[in-house]
């Protein structure tokens, strides 16, 4: 009887170990599948980051040109260094391009979050950077964009009595948001005595600087993000 009991006990342990091993193997396989899917998403992420970097570089170039225009227009207001044609050109570029916005592609980040795959990322540095770029920077981006929109609604109305520039499409300039040129303009005789004009240029300059600083942060973040994603893929390849 004792011998029979021991036999049953051994069989029980064998079956138990088999079931436990089966569960362990199944869990390991499922985790491996999730890791592989996470890696696929990260590989796609790299492609999207490259596209965003290209878009970002265009925006940074435009913002730098807007900063130059605001400097030129402020200097002209106090020193009258520009012809009316050049004044109209600089004003048109500034007014049509300073409101440019950057929209990073965040669909894959949302997918990582919603699927729980982000928790499978080994590098805590990578997880933190993803949150910084696609949440913290995005919040700042949205806030600055709203500020720019509000600024446009009020400021252009304020300066409309002093300067109006009409534009038309230009095939010569293919940069985003800037493919227009002056068609005609109306600059009032009170332009150089207006208080609204320098206030408009000064605030434009400040907002351009704030947005350019944020774009610099994005650029640094994307550069680091590429490196960290590649390290993650090498670690779990």
Region locations from a protein language model:
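Long, hydrophobic alpha-helical segments that serve as membrane-spanning/inserting helices
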Residues: 1-2, 6, 27-237
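Hydrophobic membrane-insertion alpha-helices, especially the h-region
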Residues: 11-24
């Amino acid at each position: 009887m004792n011998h029979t009991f021991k036999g049953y006990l051994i069989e029980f342990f064998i079956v138990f170990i088999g079931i436990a091993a089966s569960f362990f193997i199944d869990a390991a396989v499922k985790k491996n599948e999730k890791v592989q899917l996470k890696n696929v998403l990260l590989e796609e992420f790299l492609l999207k980051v490259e596209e965003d970097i290209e878009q970002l570089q265009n925006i940074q170039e435009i913002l730098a040109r807007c900063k130059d225009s605001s400097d030129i227009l402020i200097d002209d207001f106090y020193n009258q260094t520009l012809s009316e044609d050049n004044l109209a050109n600089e004003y048109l570029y500034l007014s049509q391009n300073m409101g440019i916005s950057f929209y990073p592609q965040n669909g894959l980040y949302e997918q990582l979050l919603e699927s729980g795959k982000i928790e499978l990322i080994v590098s805590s540095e990578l997880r933190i950077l993803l949150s910084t770029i696609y949440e913290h920077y995005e919040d700042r981006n949205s806030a600055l964009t709203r500020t720019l929109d509000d600024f446009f609604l009020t400021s252009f109305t304020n300066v409309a009595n002093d300067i109006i520039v009409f534009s038309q499409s230009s095939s010569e300039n293919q940069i985003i948001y800037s493919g227009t040129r002056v068609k005609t303009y109306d600059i009032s005789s009170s332009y150089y005595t207006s208080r609204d004009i320098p206030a408009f240029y000064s605030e434009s300059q400040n907002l351009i600087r704030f947005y350019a600083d944020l774009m610099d942060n994005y650029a640094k973040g994307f550069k680091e993000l590429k490196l960290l994603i590649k390290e993650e893929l090498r670690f779990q390849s």
